[in-house]
Amino acid sequence: MIRSHEHLARKLGIPFRDPGLLRNALTHRSAEGVNNERLEFLGDSVLGFVVTEYLYQRFPSADEGVLSRLRATLVNETSLARIARELELGEYLILGSGELKSGGYRRDSILSDALEAILGAVLRDQGIDACRALILTLFERPLSALSLDDWKKDPKTRLQELMQGRGLPLPVYTLIDQSGLPHDQHFRVRCEVPLAVEPCVGEGSSRKKAEQQAAENMLSRLSDQSRFRV
């Protein structure tokens, strides 16, 4: 059963004047009625603008190339899907029967598109200031952890170097699930390292993306352990 969209609005802290905009943002193209593609287009643009503005102000000495790479570490399908999962966005999506049966509510591409569509809906309903505030809230953790070195190394490389620097075995990645149609696959990968008691799981539209997300999730977990600096 789809959870109440009013509940999601409260979770976001957005009092929508037009609740229909939020419903549209959560409606996948596989469902009947107005879908979220136009709002996604708008949300993608405002997200890029707000993150670019933030980076420009925070790193005044960084050149255009560095700023672009930093933005790419923040604005991508994997990071957006991770935030969408933190919001449990899949439980609010309106999907067609085929997408519902195939687990579309778990798919990175659908989750990230829906999150961008929500940002577009907030922009339309509340204006740029409210939309900017929401983006900075949703991205607060990755933004606060950002450094000028982030664009140089991907999560798998950083995790591998962390293990090597401590003389520990390298991370182990295991494919635990693969589903979806041939043109729209969904992968789940488990990452295990000696520093963590429990493994971390990553998801993505390819095994490579799932491994990168699993590594990033593991780095986030280790960064919460005060004796490790990731």
Swiss-Prot record:
The active site is at residues 44, 116. Its cofactor is Mg(2+). Residues 5-127 form the RNase III domain. GO terms for biological process: mRNA processing; regulation of gene expression; rRNA processing; tRNA processing. PANTHER family: RIBONUCLEASE 3, RIBONUCLEASE III. Digests double-stranded RNA. Involved in the processing of primary rRNA transcript to yield the immediate precursors to the large and small rRNAs (23S and 16S). Processes some mRNAs, and tRNAs when they are encoded in the rRNA operon. Processes pre-crRNA and tracrRNA of type II CRISPR loci if present in the organism. Belongs to the ribonuclease III family. This is Ribonuclease 3. It comes from Methylococcus capsulatus (strain ATCC 33009 / NCIMB 11132 / Bath). The gene is rnc.
